[in-house]
Amino acid sequence: MTSRPLILGSSSIWRKQVLIDMGYIFKTMSPDIDEKAIRDSDPKTLTLLISRAKAQALLKRIKESDDELDKKSIMICSDQVIVHNGVIREKPETEQQCREYLQSYEFHPAVAVVSVVVVNIETGKIVEGTDIATQHFKKISDEFIDKLIKQGDVMHCAGGFTVEHMADFTLQLEGEVETILGLPKTLTKNLISQVSQ
């Protein structure tokens, strides 16, 4: 744990839940950057670049604000992509694309690549890292895919799926479920510890 206030640089309900489950008290701020303007063919590099951009956008906003507590905080920003059979997948752009994503996971697993950038705003210390987890699925029925898409959450998730809604179709998980959710628990805890010293 840290004695400094925490800021989660994300509006993701899944990242929020990971931090809550870890026992942290924090506030959230949305970076509001154009992630599509940042491109790289390597998933680790891409997620690091986007995480850094999120952190820089929020740092600028915090430094220009009058909130002294924010200026003494530790900020966490992360980004996630899913790699499927060597191809990077971000959030689906259409329902059809989401449907194709979900139908494909029975053939190749979903590999979550998540980068995290943690900043001690007061000292300026920045640390970062990347974690990977692989989720294997069995065939997901068309009826269930329709239900997921209608419900809507999957349209806001890298790779077009949410593990909490798909328990009946999940097989082996290699790595942390928190990585699949978008915020690796062990990595995040270690990075917070590093900037707290």
Swiss-Prot record:
It comes from the Eukaryota. It holds the Pfam family Maf. Its EC number is 3.6.1.-. Gene3D superfamilies: 3.90.950.10. The keyword Calcium does not apply. GO terms for molecular function: nucleoside triphosphate diphosphatase activity. Its main location: cytoplasm. Coiled coil: none annotated. The active site is at residue 79. It catalyses: N(7)-methyl-GTP + H2O = N(7)-methyl-GMP + diphosphate + H(+). The record marks 14, 80, 164 as: Important for substrate specificity. Nucleoside triphosphate pyrophosphatase that hydrolyzes 7-methyl-GTP (m(7)GTP). May have a dual role in cell division arrest and in preventing the incorporation of modified nucleotides into cellular nucleic acids. One of its GO terms (biological process) is nucleotide metabolic process. Belongs to the Maf family. YceF subfamily. Keywords: Cytoplasm, Hydrolase, Nucleotide metabolism. It is found in: Cytoplasm. SUPFAM superfamilies: ITPase-like (SSF52972). It is an enzyme of class 3 (hydrolase). This is 7-methyl-GTP pyrophosphatase. GO terms for cellular component: cytoplasm.
